[in-house]
Amino acid sequence: MLYIISAPSGTGKSSLLQALLRTKRLPLHEIRISISHTTRAMRPGEINGQHYYFISVEEFEKLIDQDAFLEYARVFNHYYGTLRQEVDSILINSVDILLDIDWQGAKQIYAIRKDVRSIFIIPPSKDELHRRLHKRGQDQEEVINQRISQAVAEMIHYTEYDYLIINDDFHTALSDLNTIICAEQLHMNNQKIRYKTLISRLLQ
């Protein structure tokens, strides 16, 4: 199963995903996060190949010409994209995958795949979003205001998703994310594929 996770900048999405991957009890089955390619500069603390693959605009556009991306979008004048090969190599091993992408990428994937569930994460208020962006210390006030305006434009698309999480309290939001993924992993359509051999033996 492929899980699309989208949220405006500053909502806490990256922290939630990293916490989810560190959780030992949940989800029930193995899950990995796809590492996207981007043309933006690395931020302090980021590691190439762990947070993103940081490449040039020329390299990115060459990959576009090669139809290498499952999805891609231009956000804040930077490219972001998910390589088709990386996603396929994970899914072929019956491992669930998380895609940290925006609504534009989600729309592209929905058009070509059916094995998808989508989750949209929003902040409890604009004031709280502003506080988080300011606390992050990465942008000037003008850029923060631009990000908030962009966040509103992104949040308009929340009804296009299967699930909605309000990240007011981090631990509650993490629990909600765990619950959604565990429920999907237990869905009949997924379980009968995952345990096809076991079920076949039981019914002989």
From Swiss-Prot:
Keyword Transcription: no
Top-rank taxon, per record: Bacteria
Alphabetic keyword roster: ATP-binding, Cytoplasm, Kinase, Nucleotide-binding, Transferase
Residues annotated to bind ATP: 7-14
Gene Ontology CC terms: cytosol
Cellular compartments annotated: Cytoplasm
Domain Guanylate kinase-like: 1-182
UniProt GO molecular function: ATP binding; guanylate kinase activity
Function: Essential for recycling GMP and indirectly, cGMP.
The family this protein is said to belong to: Belongs to the guanylate kinase family.
Listed name of the protein: Guanylate kinase
Species name: Baumannia cicadellinicola subsp. Homalodisca coagulata
